[in-house]
Amino acid sequence: MNEQSPALRNFTINFGPQHPAAHGVLRLVLELDGEVVERVDPHIGLLHRGTEKLIETKTYLQAMPYFDRLDYVAPMNQEHAFCLAAERLLGIEVPRRGQLIRVLYSEIGRLLSHLLNVTTQAMDVGALTPPLWGFEEREKLMVFYERASGSRMHANYFRIGGVHQDLPPKLIDDIDAFCDPFLKVVDDLDQLLTGNRIFKQRNVDIGVVTLKQAWEWGFSGVMVRGSGAAWDLRKSQPYDVYAEMEFDVPIGKNGDCYDRYLIRMEEMRQSVRIMKQCIQKLRAPDGQGPVVVTDNKIAPPRRGEMKRSMEALIHHFKLYTEGVHVPAGEIYAAVEAPKGEFGVYLVSDGSNKPYKCKIRAPGFAHLQAMDFLCRGHLLADVSAILGSLDIVFGEVDR
C-alpha cells in the first residue's frame, strides 16, 4: 500500500456572529494553519438597515435621529457632522453658546467611546476589572446625556443651527464636578493595565501598521495617530469652537495595539481638558446668549413668542410640517469622531429632504484591513487586534 498521504488542508472556522469578542454582529471566516491565521474574511451586513436610503425620505429634522443609531456608543458626534453639513449649505453661523455646548457634548461622547473601548479591549485579553470601573463612569456620563436631551443613548439633541435646549446651570456644575475625580479613575485604569505584564505581552507588536500603510488603507483617528501622524480634524480643520481650545494630540511610534491603547488613555485626559475649558467659557459673560440661530425659518420660535405673534406660530407650523429648505448644492463635512473621521457628504436639491446623504464611517475602513492586520498572527491575537480597531457595527453596516 503506497497510497500518497492526503495533502494537508488549512482549517476554516467561523468567528462570530455570536462570539463575545466579536463586538456586535461581526462574522469572520478564518483560515488557520494550526494556530496561525492565514486569511481573514470579514462578513458584514448583518446590521444593515438602509439608513442612507431612509434619510432621503425624511426631512432634515426627521433625519437627525438616524445618526444616533450609527455609532451608538457616542451618538452626538455623528449628529454634529450632519448639522455642520446642512449649516454650511445654509450659510449660517451657530451662536457661540450653542457651539460650546456641542463641543462639550462631543467630548463627553469621546469619553463614552474610549471608556468602552479601552475596558473591553482589556476584557478581550483577559482583564476583568477595567470594564466594571469603566462602566461606572459611563453611567455618570449617560446621566449627563439624559439631563440634556431626555435620553441616555439616542439623544437627538443637536439641531441645524445649534442645539435643542440650553443646559441648566446645575448640570454645568455637575459636569464640572465630574472632571477631576474622573481623571483619578483614568489613572487607576492606567495603573491596572499600562505596566501589566500580561496586557503588554498580548498587545505589544500585535497588529502593527506603518504610517504609509495607514494612509493607503484609508485609516483615520487613533489608527493613524498610533502610527505616528498627528492628524486630528479638531486641529487640522477646526470646526465650531475647537480653534480656541488648548489640547494636545497624542501620537504613537510603533503603530501596534498597545500604542493605540495608550493614545486612547491620553485622549481621555485631553477631552477632560477641553470639557473644563468649555465649562469655563459657558460661565463667562460672552458664553451667554441663545443656543440656536434666531432665524425662524431654520429654528422654531420661542414659546412665549408664539403666544404673542401669529407669524411665529406660522413659522413653527411650517417648520414641523414641511421642514427646512436647504439650498441646492453639495458639501462634505467631517468631524473627528472617537473612532476616526466621520464624514457626511450631503447633496441637496433645494427641497426639504436631502437628495443624497452619503455617510463615511471610520470603522468601515478599519474593518476592511482585518485580513492585512491579522495575517501571520495567532488565533488568540485576532480578538486583541479587533479590540484595538474600535469597531461598532451600527456605522459599518449602516
UniProtKB/Swiss-Prot annotation:
Q: In the UniProt record, does the keyword Acyltransferase occur? A: no
Q: Which GO cellular component term is one of those annotated?
A: plasma membrane
MF terms from GO for this chain are: NAD binding; NADH:ubiquinone reductase (non-electrogenic) activity; quinone binding
> What EC number(s) would the UniProt record show?
7.1.1.-
Query: Can you tell which superkingdom this protein's organism belongs to?
Result: Bacteria
Gene3D superfamilies annotated for this entry? Answer: Cytochrome-c3 Hydrogenase, chain B
Classify the main location.
Answer: membrane
What reaction is this protein's catalytic activity?
A: a quinone + NADH + 5 H(+)(in) = a quinol + NAD(+) + 4 H(+)(out)
Name of this chain's protein? NADH-quinone oxidoreductase subunit D
Designated gene of the protein: nuoD
